[in-house]
């Protein structure tokens, strides 16, 4: 199996959306499901964007784990991404009483 196949198998939760037999959107969470979940992937094919599919997937994911203390994601910084995630209740870590860091090896 490839690294991607192993990563998908080890995921906490995932959901895919198909149009007929064609994959058009996918969300994948990692974490323990109790204290933390991390939105590892939220992908919507460009020709299916702006239709509410990503919003529905993320809403379903968050509703599946309502009592998790930390719900995190990391994404490319853009006004579009900021607006989308903020509309769903996410805030930037810099606005919180915590520090977000990444390890660069």
Residue ranges and their predicted role:
Residues 1-14:
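Active-site rim helix/loop that mediates acceptor-substrate recognition in acyltransferases
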Residues 16, 21-31, 35-43:
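Conserved beta-strand in the GNAT
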Residues 44, 50-63, 87:
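Conserved acetyl-CoA-binding loop-helix of GNAT-fold acetyltransferases
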Residues 58, 63-76:
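Conserved GNAT acetyl-CoA-binding A-motif
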Residues 72-82, 100-104:
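Conserved beta-strand-loop-alpha-helix junction that forms the acyl-donor binding cleft
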Residues 84-85, 90:
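Conserved active-site tyrosine of GNAT-family acetyltransferases
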Residues 91, 95-105:
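Active-site/acyl-donor-binding loops of N-acyltransferases
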């Amino acid at each position: 199996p490839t690294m991607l196949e192993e990563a998908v198998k080890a995921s906490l939760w995932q959901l895919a959306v198909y149009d007929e037999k064609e994959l058009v959107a996918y969300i994948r969470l990692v974490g323990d499901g109790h204290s933390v979940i991390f939105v590892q992937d939220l992908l919507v094919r460009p020709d299916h964007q702006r239709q509410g599919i990503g919003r529905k997937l993320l809403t379903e994911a968050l509703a599946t784990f309502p009592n998790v203390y930390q719900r995190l994601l990391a994404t490319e910084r853009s006004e579009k991404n900021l607006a989308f995630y903020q509309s769903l209740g996410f805030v930037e870590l810099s606005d919180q009483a915590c520090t977000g860091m990444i390890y660069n090896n």
